[in-house]
From Swiss-Prot:
PANTHER family named among the record's database cross-references: MANNOSE-6-PHOSPHATE ISOMERASE
Lineage per the UniProt record: Eukaryota, Metazoa, Chordata, Craniata, Vertebrata
Protein name: Mannose-6-phosphate isomerase
Keywords: Acetylation, Cytoplasm, Isomerase, Metal-binding, Phosphoprotein, Zinc
Cofactor details (free text): Binds 1 zinc ion per subunit.
InterPro entries per UniProt: Man6P_Isoase-1, Mannose-6-P_Isomerase, Pmannose_isomerase-type1_CS, PMI_typeI_C, PMI_typeI_cat, PMI_typeI_hel, RmlC-like_jellyroll, RmlC_Cupin_sf
Modified residues (Phosphoserine): 102, 108
Natural source organism: Bos taurus
Enzyme Commission number(s) from the entry: 5.3.1.8
Broad class of where this protein is predominantly found: cytoplasm
UniProt pathway: Nucleotide-sugar biosynthesis; GDP-alpha-D-mannose biosynthesis; alpha-D-mannose 1-phosphate from D-fructose 6-phosphate: step 1/2
Gene3D superfamilies: Jelly Rolls (2.60.120.10), Phosphomannose Isomerase, domain 2 (1.10.441.10)
Cofactor(s) for this UniProt protein: Zn(2+)
């Protein structure tokens, strides 16, 4: 009899302090829906759901006929289930980590090193850089999702330098003048000027940052109290971040970085060396399996300023250029594919109207993980010994080259996301 290669998973929840509290969190709601025994504490944060084999959150297999207890153990014993190319390319390991995030307070402004730099940093400082892999990542909004991503067009930064004297003070007159001059120069001059400005900010003395930030917060608060709109200098966002991280250098980074609000289904892709921060909302996220982060602010953690200023990609672009649109599948009218320019992962979104009663999940030459966000189905496959019921929050592992038939058991629209590796 064929070994079972399709089975449900119980996934690990991370309760980081920045997560949404209790049942306000999409992570908690997915957990409560999929596990009738789950008890949600309204006074605890539910930040991330991890779907994968990462040692800090290896998914448990919900099928007692399978001897291995976790997905990581099972894949180690069944490497062919990864798909032949994936197995060879990624040394018999699942190359991606799939997540749901529920963000209440801002995550640190950060960037992830490319493969070459990751290897170097890991050798030099393994306590800060725990592995030698790169960490490209993609976020797809489930609810309106706010984030900072990549450097703004220089014109916008120059406008902020004029309108926010506290920002100009920290950058310094020379670096600010260099940035203004670069507007009429080539891209190399822009990159150099932007690096100089950002480095000046990041290397500012803590005492001076706190003084200037307090001046700015006081000024914005007084204007808001007088009924004035301060959106031209991102007043509301600055006050929000200052309340969350008082005196933090990262509060000024909003004048360098694009502010994006993704609508549900919209995505942003964060390649190596792009500065970014998630601010608020719920999303599905997929990334290469790595834990390397170089932080720049909005954090009490270690900030490696020299590495950060050296590694960043100082390429300004308008915020709409940071959006990563999916492609519609030519074979399947219900399928959208988010396929970023890295080999480690691809995410598929499946939206099936409630009027449809059956849906076939295509076989791929890659292991994949399927998450049900809305809807109720029963899954069956040639190797599964019995039908597998899945409702909102349910997670299914699908081995390479396995097809799965889904029966929609409730006439409601079905929304699912599937992470895989298309080489």
């Amino acid at each position: 009899m064929a070994a079972q290669r399709v089975f449900p998973l119980s996934c690990v929840v991370q309760q980081y302090a920045w997560g949404k509290m209790g049942s306000n969190s999409e992570v908690a709601r997915l957990l409560a829906s999929s596990d009738p025994l789950a008890q949600i504490s309204e006074d605890r944060p539910y930040a991330e759901l991890w779907m994968g084999t990462h040692p800090r959150g290896d998914a448990k297999i919900l099928d007692n006929r399978i001897s291995q207890k976790t997905l990581g153990q099972w894949i180690a014993d069944n490497q062919d289930s990864l798909g032949s190319k994936v197995k060879d390319t990624f040394n018999g390991k699942l190359p991606f980590l799939f997540k749901v995030l529920s963000v209440e307070t801002a995550l640190s402004i950060q960037a992830h090193p490319n493969k070459e730099l990751a290897e170097k940093l890991h050798l030099q400082a393994p306590q800060h850089y725990p592995d030698a892999n790169h960490k490209p990542e993609m976020a797809i909004a489930l609810t309106p999702f706010q984030g900072l991503c990549g450097f703004r067009p220089v014109e916008e930064i120059v406008t902020f330098l004029t309108k926010v004297p506290e920002f100009q003070f920290l950058i310094g007159d020379n670096a600010a003048a260099q940035l203004k001059q670069s507007l009429s120069q080539d891209s190399e001059a822009v990159t150099s000027a932007l690096r100089s400005c950002f480095s000046h900010l990041m290397k500012s003395e803590k005492k001076v940052v706190v003084e200037q930030l307090n001046l700015l917060v006081k000024r914005i608060s007084q204007q808001v109290a007088a009924g004035n709109n301060m959106e031209d200098i991102c007043g509301e966002l600055l006050l929000q971040l200052h309340q969350q991280y008082p005196g933090d250098i990262g509060c000024f980074a909003i004048y360098f970085l694009n502010l994006l609000t993704l609508k549900p289904g919209e995505a942003m892709f964060l390649e190596a060396n792009v500065p970014h921060a998630y601010l608020k909302g719920d999303c599905v996220e997929c990334m290469a399996c790595s834990d390397n982060t170089v932080r720049a602010g909005l954090t009490p953690k270690f900030i490696d300023v020299p590495t950060l200023c050296e590694m960043l990609s100082y390429t300004p672009s308008p915020s709409q250029d940071r959006l990563f649109p999916p492609a519609r599948s030519p074979e399947d009218p219900y399928l959208s594919i988010y396929d970023p320019p890295v080999p480690d992962f691809t995410v598929m979104k499946v939206e099936v109207p409630g009027s449809v009663t059956e849906y076939k999940v295509l076989a791929l030459d890659s292991a994949s993980i399927l998450l049900v966000v809305q809807g109720t189905v029963t899954a069956s496959s040639p190797t599964a010994q019995a039908a597998i019921p899945l409702k909102r929050g349910g997670v299914l592992f699908i081995g390479a080259n396995e097809s799965v038939s889904l029966k929609l058991t409730v006439p409601k629209d079905l929304l699912m996301f599937r992470a895989c590796c298309l080489l």
